[in-house]
C-alpha cells in the first residue's frame, strides 16, 4: 500500500489511527475480529458494484454526501464500530476509488491483527504467515493453483482453507484467505507482506535470513539485537534454511543484502580469479 498517492496515504493514516482508538476503547477481541471481517465483506460488495465503489470515494462530491451514502447502504448490515470506520473513510479525500478500496482492505487487516494482539497472538500470527509464504515458495503446484485467475475467488479460498484447517490461528487463516481471494501481486509476496505488516504493528522491521543450518531461538534473538544496533530499529527475524549455502547466511533488510554465506564467498573468490 506504499504505492498509494499522498492524499490516500494521509487518509489511510487518519482512519487507521481512528480505528485503533475505537478498538482500544472497546478492547474486546470479538469486536476487533468482527470489524476486520466486515470490512473485508464491504470490499467484496464494492468489488461487485463499480458505481457504488466510485460514488463512495468521489472527491468531487461533498464529504457528507459520501458519508450519507455509506449509512444508507451499510447501516444495519454491519456493526456500529465498522459503520463508523466506513463513514470516517468516506469522509476523507482519496486519490482514486481503487485506493479507497485498497485502504479498506488495509483497515480490515489491521483490525484482525489488533484482535490477535489483544489475544497475545500477534507474534504467532506473524510467524505463521511467514511460514505459509515459505511453504508457498516451495510448493509450486499449490501456488500455481492459488494463482489461477480462471478459478473464482471462492474456489481458491476453499483450497487454501483445506490446507490451513486446524494448523493456524483463526486470524492467520482469515488474512490468508482474503489475500488469496483478492490478490495484489502473487500468493508468495502477498502473504509475506501480511507477515511484514504484523511485524510493523509490533514496531519492528523484517530481516529475511537464509542460513545453511536452522537458527535456534537464542541465535535469532542475538541476530535481531545485532541488526537492531546496525539499523537503529527493532528487527523481526524471518528465517529459513538453504543447505546449498554450505555455511553462513544471507540477510536481506529492505533492498539491502548482506551475503555472509560460504557459497557467496566462494563465488566472489572465483570471480576474482576469472
UniProtKB/Swiss-Prot annotation:
UniProt entry keywords in alphabetical sequence = ATP synthesis, Cell membrane, CF(1), Hydrogen ion transport, Ion transport, Membrane, Transport
A GO cellular component entry from the record: proton-transporting ATP synthase complex
Q: Where in the cell is it found?
A: Cell membrane
Topology in the lipid bilayer is annotated as:
Peripheral membrane protein
**Matches recorded under InterPro entries:** ATPase_OSCP/d_CS, ATPase_OSCP/dsu
GO MF: proton-transporting ATP synthase activity, rotational mechanism
What is the purpose of this protein? F(1)F(0) ATP synthase produces ATP from ADP in the presence of a proton or sodium gradient. F-type ATPases consist of two structural domains, F(1) containing the extramembraneous catalytic core and F(0) containing the membrane proton channel, linked together by a central stalk and a peripheral stalk. During catalysis, ATP synthesis in the catalytic domain of F(1) is coupled via a rotary mechanism of the central stalk subunits to proton translocation. This protein is part of the stalk that links CF(0) to CF(1). It either transmits conformational changes from CF(0) to CF(1) or is implicated in proton conduction.
**What quaternary arrangement does the UniProt entry report?**
F-type ATPases have 2 components, F(1) - the catalytic core - and F(0) - the membrane proton channel. F(1) has five subunits: alpha(3), beta(3), gamma(1), delta(1), epsilon(1). F(0) has three main subunits: a(1), b(2) and c(10-14). The alpha and beta chains form an alternating ring which encloses part of the gamma chain. F(1) is attached to F(0) by a central stalk formed by the gamma and epsilon chains, while a peripheral stalk is formed by the delta and b chains.
Query: Sorted alphabetically, which HAMAP family does this protein's record hold?
Result: ATP_synth_delta_bact
| Family to which this protein belongs | Belongs to the ATPase delta chain family.
- This protein's name: ATP synthase subunit delta
Per the UniProt record, the source organism is: Corynebacterium efficiens (strain DSM 44549 / YS-314 / AJ 12310 / JCM 11189 / NBRC 100395)
Q: Provide the gene name from the record.
A: atpH
Amino acid at each position: 500500500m506504499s504505492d498509494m498517492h499522498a492524499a490516500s496515504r494521509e487518509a489511510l493514516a487518519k482512519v487507521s489511527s481512528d480505528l485503533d482508538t475505537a478498538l482500544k476503547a472497546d478492547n474486546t477481541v470479538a469486536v476487533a475480529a468482527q470489524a476486520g471481517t466486515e470490512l473485508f465483506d464491504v470490499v467484496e460488495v464494492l468489488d461487485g458494484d463499480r458505481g457504488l465503489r466510485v460514488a463512495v470515494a468521489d472527491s468531487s462530491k461533498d464529504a457528507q454526501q459520501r458519508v450519507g451514502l455509506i449509512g444508507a447502504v451499510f447501516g444495519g448490515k454491519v456493526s456500529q464500530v465498522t459503520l463508523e470506520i466506513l463513514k470516517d473513510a468516506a469522509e476523507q479525500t482519496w486519490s482514486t476509488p481503487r485506493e479507497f478500496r485498497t485502504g479498506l482492505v488495509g483497515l480490515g487487516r489491521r483490525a484482525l491483527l489488533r484482535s490477535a494482539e489483544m489475544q497475545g497472538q500477534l507474534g504467532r500470527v506473524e510467524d505463521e504467515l511467514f511460514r505459509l509464504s515459505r511453504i508457498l515458495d516451495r510448493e509450486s503446484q499449490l501456488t500455481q493453483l492459488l494463482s489461477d485467475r480462471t478459478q473464482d475467488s471462492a474456489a481458491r479460498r476453499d483450497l487454501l482453507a483445506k490446507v490451513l484447517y486446524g494448523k493456524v490461528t483463526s486470524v492467520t487463516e482469515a488474512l490468508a484467505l482474503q489475500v488469496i481471494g483478492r490478490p495484489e501481486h502473487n500468493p508468495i509476496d502477498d502473504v509475506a507482506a501480511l507477515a511484514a505488516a504484523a511485524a510493523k504493528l509490533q514496531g519492528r522491521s523484517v530481516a529475511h535470513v537464509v542460513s545453511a543450518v536452522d537458527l535456534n531461538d537464542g541465535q535469532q534473538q542475538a541476530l535481531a539485537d545485532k541488526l537492531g544496533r546496525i539499523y537503529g530499529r527493532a528487527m523481526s527475524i524471518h528465517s529459513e534454511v538453504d543447505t546449498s549455502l554450505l555455511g553462513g547466511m544471507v540477510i536481506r533488510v529492505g533492498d539491502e543484502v548482506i551475503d555472509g554465506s560460504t557459497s557467496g564467498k566462494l563465488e566472489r573468490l572465483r570471480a576474482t580469479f576469472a
